[in-house]
């Protein structure tokens, strides 16, 4: 994946697979840490699996930077809200890393209601020679203690521990859809359908409500919050998107409750494209600031749009992800696929964007050359270190040998979650219960 998306130079490795997928094994979020050395995935079973990149070896060039399992832990358990008689799923909705400050790693994970701060650390020594406890940790009889011992640290096999350091609960009435760490690294926000809360990492029993769009009469509700993110450099600025296809940029310096936006991004609808499904497919499923902070990228059902922060009336770029599905919206509505929430990501230099589609396809768009490519993440078509071939979807008429008909697309195979290494051309793609890593091929 050079800057012009040279698909001839893509190879892949296959990381996580269960031949017989259960609902709990389906990957629900993927996220690289700030250095790209670690890659975290969360699944519907409430588990977090962290992969660590291998150090490059001169005598094994083909194993350049492969990722192996580093730690696995149960982040969330299923719960029951007795006041509302509602089950709370253990599914991990989002994972966000904090920048590394010391030898340990910290990450946030959230399900529908509760955000947790996890510390992931290594141990390769253990203390021995306590005076009041024996080697098993049991208290010794003081009468048997005749000498004073100085405890010592003994080497042991490397062990990776994940411990919950903070639990942020009881602040969301509705389902959490986004968490975002602020650039001050002291605060973060969590967003649900109607509210956005601001948290301090040190305070778990109190949060500040910074956005509240809940009407006094719920019958007047016309839109919900679908995603939210802090600006990468300005700690006072954040954006949130809505189910109406609008994006609001807010400045926390203006007021404590950001009920008035600073900027409002919306593209006027083309009357010729108006249909029963217009409002559904215009709902934004993901919003991402570029690394530079100059642009916002949004994903709706059929397109990816790039907005300049200085121009609110229309996007500067619009990319068709799978426009061939426009004629299939009726059947996609009937099987609920039209409500799928696809994510989108930038590459490290903001020059290429990536998002998922159906049939285990994912799309890449080069913003400079305007070239795009469709690739497939599947076991049948991609063995480890094999070169990926571009795929094409045929709409009616004659179908070429290397094309796939739009009628034969498998809508149960979908790529909703992807991640891009912060500085290298390495991507992670979650296809149901399988995780794929794709990278530049070594020449």
From Swiss-Prot:
Any one biological process term the GO annotation gives: apoptotic process
WD repeat coordinates: 22-61, 87-128, 171-209, 220-260, 279-317, 334-375, 410-442
Phosphothreonine: modified positions: 298
Residues in coiled coil: none
Residue positions, PTM Phosphoserine: 275
Consequence of substituting residue 138 to P: Found in a patient with moderate intellectual disability, autism and intractable epilepsy; uncertain significance
Annotated positions of the Phosphotyrosine modification: 295
Superkingdom to which the source organism belongs: Eukaryota
Tissues expressed in: Brain.
InterPro entries, A to Z: PP2A_PR55 (IPR000009), PP2A_PR55_CS (IPR018067), WD40/YVTN_repeat-like_dom_sf (IPR015943), WD40_repeat_dom_sf (IPR036322), WD40_rpt (IPR001680)
Domain-related comment: The N-terminal 26 residues of isoform 2 constitute a cryptic mitochondrial matrix import signal with critical basic and hydrophobic residues, that is necessary and sufficient for targeting the PP2A holoenzyme to the outer mitochondrial membrane (OMM) and does not affect holoenzyme formation or catalytic activity.
Medical condition linked: Spinocerebellar ataxia 12: Spinocerebellar ataxia is a clinically and genetically heterogeneous group of cerebellar disorders. Patients show progressive incoordination of gait and often poor coordination of hands, speech and eye movements, due to degeneration of the cerebellum with variable involvement of the brainstem and spinal cord. SCA12 is an autosomal dominant cerebellar ataxia (ADCA).
Family, as annotated: Belongs to the phosphatase 2A regulatory subunit B family.
Protein name: Serine/threonine-protein phosphatase 2A 55 kDa regulatory subunit B beta isoform
Natural source organism: Homo sapiens
Annotated gene: PPP2R2B
């Amino acid at each position: 994946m050079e800057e012009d998306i040279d698909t001839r130079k893509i190879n892949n490795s296959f990381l996580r697979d269960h031949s017989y997928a259960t609902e709990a094994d389906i990957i629900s979020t993927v996220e690289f840490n700030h250095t790209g050395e670690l890659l975290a995935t969360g699944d519907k079973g409430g588990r977090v699996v962290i992969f660590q990149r291998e150090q490059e070896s001169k005598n094994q060039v083909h194993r350049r930077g492969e990722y192996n399992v580093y730690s696995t832990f149960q982040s969330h358990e299923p719960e029951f809200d007795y006041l509302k008689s509602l089950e709370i799923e253990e599914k991990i909705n989002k994972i966000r890393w904090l920048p590394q400050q010391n030898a340990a790693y910290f990450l946030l994970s959230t399900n529908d209601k509760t955000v947790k701060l996890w510390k992931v650390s290594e141990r390769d020594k253990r203390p021995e020679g306590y005076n009041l406890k024996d080697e098993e940790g049991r208290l010794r009889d003081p009468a048997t203690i005749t000498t004073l011992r100085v405890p010592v640290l003994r080497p042991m096999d490397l062990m990776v521990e994940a411990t919950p350091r903070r639990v942020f609960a009881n602040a969301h009435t509705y389902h959490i859809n986004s968490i975002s760490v602020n650039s001050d690294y002291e605060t973060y926000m969590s967003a649900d359908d109607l509210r956005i809360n601001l948290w301090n990492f040190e305070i778990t029993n109190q949060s500040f409500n910074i956005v509240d769009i809940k009407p006094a009469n719920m019958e007047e509700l016309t839109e919900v919050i679908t995603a939210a993110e802090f600006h990468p450099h300005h700690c006072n600025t954040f954006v949130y998107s809505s189910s109406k296809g609008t994006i609001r940029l807010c400045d926390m310096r203006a007021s404590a409750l950001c009920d008035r936006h600073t900027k409002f991004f919306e593209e006027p609808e083309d009357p010729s494209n108006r249909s029963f499904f217009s409002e559904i497919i215009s709902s934004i499923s993901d919003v991402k600031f570029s690394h530079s902070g100059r642009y916002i990228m949004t994903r709706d059902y059929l397109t990816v749009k790039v907005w300049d922060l200085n121009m609110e009336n229309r996007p500067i770029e619009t990319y068709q992800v799978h426009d061939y599905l426009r004629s299939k919206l009726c059947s996609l509505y009937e099987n609920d696929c039209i409500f799928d929430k696809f994510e989108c990501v930038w590459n490290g230099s903001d020059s290429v964007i990536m998002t998922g589609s159906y049939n285990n396809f994912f799309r890449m768009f080069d913003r400079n050359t305007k070239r795009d490519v469709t690739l497939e993440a599947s076991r049948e078509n991609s063995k480890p270190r094999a070169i990926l071939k571009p795929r094409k979807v045929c709409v009616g008429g004659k179908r070429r040998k290397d094309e796939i008909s739009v009628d034969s697309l498998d809508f149960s195979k979908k790529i909703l979650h992807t991640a891009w290494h912060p500085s290298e051309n390495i991507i992670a793609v979650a296809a149901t219960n399988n995780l794929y890593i794709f990278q530049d091929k070594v020449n």
